[in-house]
From Swiss-Prot:
GO cellular component, one term: cytoplasm
Catalytic activity, reaction form: L-threonine + hydrogencarbonate + ATP = L-threonylcarbamoyladenylate + diphosphate + H2O
Organism: Pseudomonas entomophila (strain L48)
Any GO MF annotation of the entry: ATP binding
UniProt EC number: 2.7.7.87
Protein name in UniProt: Threonylcarbamoyl-AMP synthase
PANTHER family: SUA5, THREONYLCARBAMOYL-AMP SYNTHASE
The UniProt record lists the keyword tRNA processing: yes
Length: 185
């Protein structure tokens, strides 16, 4: 396990506009502050990912997403709460409360409360975080720090070392309003 001071250093970097790599439940992730437009566009450029596709936000606990849930039915909140923390990503209406560089051309945003200890510690310090697989578009997601370095060599501000969470597949993605599975887990 990476020492807490490294996670604190990563939090300082993110707050300063950094793009970082870190281990998640199944693959390495790239992340940054969702409110920092320059950081998000830099992350998108590193991945060669179009902004219109949208990005996932991860958090330490469901309360970090409360600003989005004000008008949600209680059963929606209960449904998400029953699956978090864990490998479940929900597409929820963003109600124009998030910037376009996060949501892309969608009326929904993807949210997950991670169960990876380092990710949770980092999000507890910085709030919700952009999280996307650590790979250039069209390449397999990094499953090792070596692959992270091969993909992005000196282009990242920080690589937070640590172990993956042991899951074989990325998270399940479901639409909160319809229950439809968008991506199997």
């Amino acid at each position: 396990m990476v020492s807490s001071w490294r996670v604190q250093q990563a939090a300082r970097e993110v707050k300063a506009g950094a793009v970082i790599a870190y281990p998640t439940e199944a693959v390495w992730g790239l992340g940054c502050d969702p409110w920092n437009e320059d950081a998000v566009y830099r992350l998108l450029a590193l991945k060669s990912r179009p902004v219109d596709k949208g990005l996932i936000l991860i958090a330490d606990n469901i309360r970090q997403f409360d600003f989005l849930f004000e008008d949600f039915p209680q059963d929606w909140i209960d449904r998400m709460s029953a699956t978090w923390p864990g490998p479940n990503t929900w597409l929820v209406p963003h109600q124009d409360l998030l910037p376009e560089w996060v949501t892309g051309q969608h009326d929904t945003v993807a949210l997950r409360v991670s169960d990876h200890p380092q990710v949770r510690e980092l999000c507890a310090l910085v709030g919700p975080l952009i999280s996307t697989s650590c790979n250039p578009a069209g390449r397999p997601a990094a499953k090792s720090r070596l692959r992270v370095e091969q993909y992005f060599h000196n282009e990242l501000d920080m690589v937070l070392g640590g172990a993956l969470g042991g899951r074989k597949n990325p998270s399940l993605i479901r639409d909160l309003a319809t229950g439809e599975v968008v991506r199997p887990g």
